Amino acid sequence: MIKTGIIGADTLPAAELLRILVNHPEVDITLLYAPELTGRQVSSVHHGFIGEDIINFSNMADPSALDVIFITDDSEYGRNLIDNRQKFPETRIIDLSPGRFQNWSSLDMEYGLSELNRKSLVRGAKYAIIPTEVASLSLIGFSPLAHYLLLGGDLTIEVAAPADLVDTIDTVALGDEIERQLRNLQTSFTGKVRIKIEPNKSQRVMRIRGLIGCNLSLEEISKIYENIYDDHNFTFMSYSPVEGREVEGTQKCIISYRKPDASTLEIEVIGDCRLRGGAGDAVHVLNLLFSLHEKTGLYLKPSRYGHTRESTSRSLSWFA
């Protein structure tokens, strides 16, 4: 079993993480670090845990006794763990703290997006930083085009996100994060990535959308995306936009594409932003670091679903 600790266990990202880890067959939750809540039960802070056999919150932590540590807050303790990680060389660290990209350039940590860096995460990586929510979906949508050297000029990405996230997103830093990863794939890409954000009606679902100049046919575009994602377990393609309930509560990410005209390609990506760029990506990285199957612990049931009659025809709202 993988002895697992969470720093900042009282945070909302930690709650999402716990809801996955409690059912992960290879994980032993050994530490829930939240000093101000020492001795309290998880169910007194996070809902959905009544009846679950989980340890209480604690203010005592021994990193060397853990196989992996998730950092979910910006506490001084979490930062010190990263700065002094050589003192416990056998412990892996996965950083999904809010301020994780402030000093990333000076850290030896893999960018924790499987769709980009699966090989490096599997082949000996010990430290990973989880992409932000918008970056996770945006890179899944546009990185195949960078792989095939199809990006040119500036890229504007429109984002429809849950209202509580809109004011927390630093669009400049986010643009820099996405640009850096795209340029790693296509060095000739010198454009700027600009982010436009507006709230949607969902509490969990995020959509991103962007237009690029592209003369390829839909069939050619489809082959590109299938070549890139054919052996990935959570990323799928669709010729038409999909409803939020297809992804809500799951690790799935669905890409749709269309040609508004012969020289333009529209890419749209939808995912659960509490999991993508958060707890779901973090557990996905955990599986890779420990050479587990990618889907271990991530067979998640959609949290919103229903029946759609075949005869029903309606356009999907960008804000759905």
Q: Which sequence ranges carry the predicted segments?
A:
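C-terminal substrate-binding/catalytic lobe of Rossmann-fold NAD(P)-dependent dehydrogenases
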Residues: 167-237
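C-terminal active-site/capping subdomain that shapes the small-molecule cofactor and substrate pocket
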Residues: 209-320
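Conserved active-site and cofactor/substrate-binding residues in soluble primary-metabolism enzymes
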Residues: 8, 12, 136-140, 173-180, ...
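Alpha-helical scaffold segments in soluble metabolic enzymes
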Residues: 16, 20, 140, 144, ...
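Residues in well-ordered beta-strands of folded domains
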Residues: 33, 114, 158, 196-198, ...
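Short, surface-exposed acidic/glycine-rich loop or hinge patches that mediate macromolecular interfaces
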Residues: 11, 75, 132, 200-202, ...
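N-terminal Rossmann-like NAD(P) cofactor-binding subdomain of oxidoreductases
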Residues: 1-172, 187-191, 258-261, 295-296, ...
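Short amphipathic alpha-helical segments
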Residues: 124-126, 204-208, 263-265
